[in-house]
From Swiss-Prot:
Entry text on domains: Lacks the C-terminal regulatory region which is replaced by HisZ.
Designated gene of the protein: hisG
InterPro entries the UniProt entry points to: ATP_PRibTrfase_cat (IPR013820), ATP_PRibTrfase_CS (IPR018198), ATP_PRibTrfase_HisG (IPR001348), ATP_PRibTrfase_HisG_short (IPR024893)
Sorted UniProt keywords: Amino-acid biosynthesis, ATP-binding, Cytoplasm, Glycosyltransferase, Histidine biosynthesis, Nucleotide-binding, Transferase
GO molecular function, one term: ATP phosphoribosyltransferase activity
Top enzyme category: transferase
One GO BP annotation of this record: L-histidine biosynthetic process
PROSITE patterns per UniProt: ATP_P_PHORIBOSYLTR
Matches recorded under Pfam families: HisG
Pathway in which the depicted protein is active: Amino-acid biosynthesis; L-histidine biosynthesis; L-histidine from 5-phospho-alpha-D-ribose 1-diphosphate: step 1/9
EC number(s) on file: 2.4.2.17
The protein's name in its UniProt record: ATP phosphoribosyltransferase
Length: 216
């Protein structure tokens, strides 16, 4: 029996995902050792392998078949644009991708003015403004605190993930438009879905049943 390999986005998401896998009967004791230097963790008995990855790399591992399954945020899936199957919304880590800025920028958005948009997610921002709003904008990619951009005059608005909106309010910014809702998703390699259909479908269905039970 070949291993089913699962790539997990590092952080809270990986921890929550492993709790779900344990609840559906796929534990991995090796992962509970926080001092371990191992990169790959296995459940030999059931034939599963797990590894932790930077979130933006998870779709790449899945597309190229280095992982059969990935657990990663919808924001990363949209930004990376990889060829894979998105099979289930895990309903964890819910938040929104939004266009944010000072109130004064609202009119510029409404009038489709040429503006600068700063974001850690340039592909999502480009798709939203080009294909949904049909507004010509200049996209500026940032890696740090994008909230700074409108404050220091780098851009009129930002496209970023919003959870509570507290950081925005503290900096005199607000949500001006919602781009899309976000949450953690399960993704599957296209070839693996055909080759290991029975085992992967069982895993998907077991996860679905568990999450639906929790939601009641």
């Amino acid at each position: 029996m070949r291993y089913i390999t699962i790539a997990l986005a590092k952080g809270r998401l990986a921890k929550k995902a492993m709790e779900i896998f344990e609840q559906i009967g796929i534990p991995c004791e090796e992962m509970k050792d926080e001092k371990t230097r191992k990169l790959i963790f296995t459940n030999e008995e059931l034939g599963f392998r797990f590894f932790l990855s930077k979130p933006s790399d998870v779709p790449t591992y899945v597309e190229y078949g280095a992982a059969d399954i990935g657990i990663v945020g919808k924001d990363t899936i949209l930004e990376e644009g990889r060829s894979l199957y998105e099979v289930y919304d895990l309903q964890m880590g819910k938040c929104r991708m939004c266009v944010c800025g000072p109130e004064s920028a609202r009119e510029k958005l409404q009038h489709h003015e040429l503006i600068r948009v700063a974001s850690k997610y340039p592909n999502i921002a480009k798709d939203y403004f080009n294909n949904i709003k049909h507004q010509t904008v200049e996209i500026i990619k940032l890696n740090g605190s994008v909230e700074l951009a409108p404050i220091v005059g780098l851009a009129e608005v930002i496209v970023d993930i919003v959870e509570t909106g507290a950081t925005l309010r503290e900096n005199g910014l607000e949500v001006l438009e919602e781009v899309c809702p976000l949450s953690a998703r399960m993704v599957v390699n296209q070839v693996s879905m055909k080759m290991e259909q029975e085992r992967i479908n069982k895993l998907i269905n077991d996860v679905k049943k568990y999450i639906e039970t929790q939601g009641r």
